Amino acid sequence: MDLSVLPNNNHPDKFLQLDVKSLTRSSALLQASLVRFPGGNYPAAQHWQNLVYSQREKKNIAAQRIRGSSADSLVTADSPPPSMSSVMKNNPLYGDLSLEEAMEERKKNPSWTIEEYDKHSLHTNLSGHLKENPNDLRFWLGDMYTPGFDTLLKKEEKQEKHSKFCRMGLILLVVISILVTIVTIITFFT
């Protein structure tokens, strides 16, 4: 296999990652499909950027995106139309800038106490978890789901019912046999 035809063959950290600076849309079919979008006045060359290109270039792209976007225009060359925003957010290459900034801010100011962690964390019940006793078995099995565990419990309950009925039947059989022997002995001696 000739590796020179692959994109980014001279950077092993970027191996087989998308390196597309711009894609020229020259097809009349693609131009016609762009007209259907709201605000369909797209330029002939649309620029696509891969947000997950490499760790060090990620911040540069985000800074360019912040500088390049304006609050007045709803649709720019860098942002998708409003109808595509839900599709973009489901895309694994989509990076929300507010989440990334919040994560960087949390890394700059770490929480050293439980109260601070509860204030700044998404998981606000850390103090409740610390009150639980790890020696208690329910602490370890609390939220765990084992596939087939409910079926196993039903099977054990069915076996317990079956053994209970068997014991009752055996006790009833013993009582009846004792009564029969007592009646036969009494009839012999009378």
UniProtKB/Swiss-Prot annotation:
A single Gene Ontology MF term assigned here is: cholesterol binding
Q: Does the keyword Transmembrane helix apply?
A: yes
Annotated Gene Ontology cellular component terms: endoplasmic reticulum; endoplasmic reticulum membrane; lysosomal membrane; stereocilium
Subcellular location(s): the record lists:
Lysosome membrane; Endoplasmic reticulum membrane
Record keywords: Deafness, Disease variant, Endoplasmic reticulum, Glycoprotein, Lysosome, Membrane, Non-syndromic deafness, Phosphoprotein, Transmembrane, Transmembrane helix
Q: Which residues cross the membrane?
A: 169-189
Q: What Gene Ontology biological process does one annotation of this record name? A: inner ear auditory receptor cell differentiation
Protein's membrane topology: Single-pass membrane protein
Assembly and partners are described as: Interacts with NOTCH2.
Per the entry, what this protein does is: Binds cholesterol and may regulate the distribution and homeostasis of cholesterol in hair cells. May play a role in angiogenesis.
Protein name per Swiss-Prot or TrEMBL: Major intrinsically disordered NOTCH2-binding receptor 1-like
